[in-house]
């Protein structure tokens, strides 16, 4: 039998779009689609038992920084605890895990970045592969999608800060790097791509305005960095050690880790806090797991408010 791809999607409309994409590409017969959530252990066990996949690409996450700052318990639940559930299920049939992470996990200033850093540790603790990327252009909800909508509506383009810079990759580049990371003989481990430079978001906005509205004078409005935002990101921290890239342009990163038993105990503390809806305890547990996480004033205020309400 030929290779098959198993797709799990939590959104019915997104799953429908995926199915139609496979039909249009004439490859629908090589795919099996599931509507469900990566936190559903019984569904995951059913999928792994039935299909026994060799490789799992885990990309499900809450990824919008402002929403994660506003909904911290939901973000921890989906980005950390659901990842733990997924990895536990995958380990029952020795599936190789490749996890898509973000440069926001490095010395995180956002709750999203901190949750992705813990998810990285979960995957690495189970012998998986982590690929830490920058911003993927034209992905769902990306800055390109937002700017394109604003241009189409004749609105000014909104950029958070004149100095805001990011690493950018195309979807094709990101997919190629995921496959390369899965096949890299140096794995399991943490990989980052060899990216040449950070780009100003304002330059991207100007390029899109020239390209999509060449006959219009499109204004750019600068607001300010949002809660959890940084002016620029980095691909590894000062406590991590990069190795020279190999032929596939991936850099292997040595990342500090703690004893597995200690890590599992800290995860259990985090899970208990989330399940009891105790934001202050969840934030404290998250900061133990990610010591270089600097919570925003918005998250700290929300935590303090929750403590007063519970008190």
Locate predicted features.
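Conserved residues in the N-terminal Rossmann fold of short-chain dehydrogenase/reductase
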Residues: 34-35, 77, 222
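Conserved Rossmann-fold NAD(P)-dependent oxidoreductase catalytic core, especially the SDR/UDP-sugar
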Residues: 52, 58, 62-117, 125
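N-terminal Rossmann/SDR dinucleotide-binding element
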Residues: 1-52
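Strand-loop microenvironment adjacent to phosphate/nucleotide-handling motifs in alpha/beta enzyme folds
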Residues: 120-311
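Conserved beta-strand scaffold in the Rossmann-like NAD(H)/NADP(H)-binding core
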Residues: 33, 99, 130-132
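Residue-level signal for the nucleotide or nucleotide-sugar donor/cofactor binding architecture
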Residues: 10, 39, 70, 78, ...
């Amino acid at each position: 039998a030929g290779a098959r791809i198993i797709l799990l999607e939590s959104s019915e409309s997104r799953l429908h779009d995926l199915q139609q994409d496979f039909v249009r590409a004439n490859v629908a017969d090589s795919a099996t689609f599931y509507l469900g959530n990566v936190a559903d252990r019984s569904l995951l066990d059913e999928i792994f038992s039935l299909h026994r996949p060799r490789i799992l690409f885990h990309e499900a996450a809450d990824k919008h920084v402002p929403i994660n700052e506003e909904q911290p318990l939901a973000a921890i639940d989906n980005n950390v605890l659901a990842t733990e559930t997924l990895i536990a299920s995958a380990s029952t049939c020795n599936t190789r895990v490749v996890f898509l992470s973000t440069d926001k996990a490095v010395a995180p200033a956002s709750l999203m970045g901190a949750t992705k850093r813990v998810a990285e540790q979960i995957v690495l603790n189970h012998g998986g592969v982590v690929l830490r990327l920058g911003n993927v252009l034209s992905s769902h909800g990306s800055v390109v999608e937002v700017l394109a909508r604003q241009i189409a509506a004749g609105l000014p383009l909104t950029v958070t800060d004149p100095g805001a810079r990011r690493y950018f990759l195309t979807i094709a580049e990101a997919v190629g790097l995921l496959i390369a990371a899965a096949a890299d003989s140096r794995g399991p481990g943490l990989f980052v791509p060899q990216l040449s430079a950070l780009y100003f978001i304002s330059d991207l906005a100007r390029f899109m305005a020239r390209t999509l509205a060449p006959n219009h004078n499109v204004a750019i409005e600068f607001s300010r960095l949002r809660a959890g935002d940084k002016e620029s990101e980095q691909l590894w921290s000062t406590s991590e050690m990069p190795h020279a890239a190999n032929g596939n342009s991936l850099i292997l990163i040595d990342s500090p880790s703690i004893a597995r038993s200690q890590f599992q105990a800290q995860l259990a503390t985090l899970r208990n806090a989330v399940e009891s809806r105790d934001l202050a305890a969840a934030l404290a547990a998250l900061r133990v797991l990610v010591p270089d996480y600097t919570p925003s004033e918005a998250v700290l205020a929300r935590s303090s408010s929750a403590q007063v309400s519970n008190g």
